[in-house]
Structures are given as C-alpha cells and as structure tokens.
Amino acid sequence: MDIAMRAVEITSIGGFDKVTWDGASDTYPSKCIMYQLSHKEALTIVHEAHLRGLVTYFSAGFKFNEIRHGVFAGVDGIGIGGAQVLRYMDSQSGMHGPYMEENIPRILANRDEAAKSARGRGVQLLARLDTMYFEGSLSREEDVLRQKLFAALLAAEETEIEDLLLRLARVAALPSEGVTPHLHRAKRLVEAERPMMKEFCSAEQWEGLLRTLRSLIVARDEANIVEEYDSDPWLSLREKYRMSQCPRDSRICYVRQASFTLQIKA
C-alpha cells in the first residue's frame, strides 16, 4: 500500500497525467493486482490519484470474474489478460495462438453489469467528484457529500450509496469528457454556482476568467483552453487553491499545476 501511494506522489511531483499499477509478478501467466490489494486499498489508491487529477490504470492479467473488482475500485482502465482471455494459450507449452475476439462481448458485458450496480454507479460518481475537487469546481456542500460517498463505498453500504446518488444528481448528470477534457473542465467551472476555487480570487478576477472561458467554450476550442489552463490567471489561481489542500504540518505538498507535455527524443 505504501508503494502504491508513493507512485501517486512521484507521478504528481513529476508533472505527469497518468499513474499505472502493474500486478505482474514472476509467475506465468500473471495474476491481476487485485490479488495484492484489498477492495478498500484499491479504492483508496485510485481515489487519492483522482484527487490529484491523475488518470489511473491497473495493468496485467484481469480475467472475466475479476473485471468487476476493477470497476468497483473506480480505476479508469484495466489490462485484460491477453494470454488468458483474448488469446489462446497452450496449457502445456505456454505457446500463444490466435486472438479470440469472440470474447470481447463477454468482457464488455461483465464490465457493464458491474457498472450498472449501485456500487458501480457510486464509484463512477466518486471519480467525477474527485476530479472536480482537483479542479476546484465543487461547492463546499458537494465536497461534504463527496467524502460521505467515499466512506459509503469503502463500507459497500448500498442504501447509503443510492441516497447519495440522488443527492448528487446534478453532478451525476454531467456529460462525459470524451476527447475534450479541458473543454469540459472549463464548462464545469463556468456552470458551477459556488465553486471552491472562486474563494481564492476577487470577484473581478473570477468574472474575467469566466468571460475568457465562455468564448472558448462556445468555439469548442480545446487547444486554446489548454493554453489558458497553463497560463495566468487560471494557473496562479489553481496554485492558491492547491496549496490550501495541503495539511498545515506537511513538509512537502505534492500537487501538479500544469498539463505540459515532455519532449522526449526517440
């Protein structure tokens, strides 16, 4: 668990956007990471990563009956066992044969069944709430409900989860981001009534930022929204908001401000 959390810390400090936990070991075929983490641990590390704006992935070896555990952890993506689910493997020699695309509908059915349950819908909502907490578009009242939802999911309290799904219906109804995450991030800020980030600037500064974002949202200009995201006043405003989230006694506050791309030569 400490190693898994350190991965979140390193990824945040490095300014990266995605963290992956790999469950591969020295066995073949490999076992998925859910054999190394309890449900509570898996949910917690994904939750902590989402609070820092990271995309999450569990790599290696998920089989049919394990897919639901990935769904209930709230992880953004999982690695399906290619040698066990999507490809024929000779049990004696270990040699791989052709891909078995006929298994894809079964994979999706297992995922969808878990996603439609109370816990599945609850953890999807938690992922969105955690992301909105990171970007500062939640209200204080919604943030209290976010914390209650996390506790209910840890305890698998389905009645409480259903109640919170109703109370947070506004957030649950927000559209998926698709291929324009910054456009939707800007829309959530513009449409929020009492976003927490607003507390860290003057009314004039806030209105100035919203005017800029509204024009870019209308134009659906993802590229220029990214530029605004990495520039002032949005950048410095996020810095103030992020620093407010750090415990007062913490020696290091690891938060990521920018969405820069690292140029790496092949």
Predicted regions span which residues?
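Catalytic cores of alpha/beta
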Residues: M5-A7, F62-G77
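Extended, intrinsically disordered, low-complexity segments
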Residues: H96-R140, E158-E191, P195-K198, F260
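Glycine-rich beta-to-alpha transition loops that act as phosphate-gripper elements at the mouths
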Residues: M1, T56-N65
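Alpha-helix-loop-beta-strand connector modules within alpha/beta enzyme cores
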Residues: M34-F58, Y99-A114
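Glycine-rich phosphate-binding active-site loops on the catalytic face of alpha/beta enzymes
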Residues: T20-Y28, A73-E101
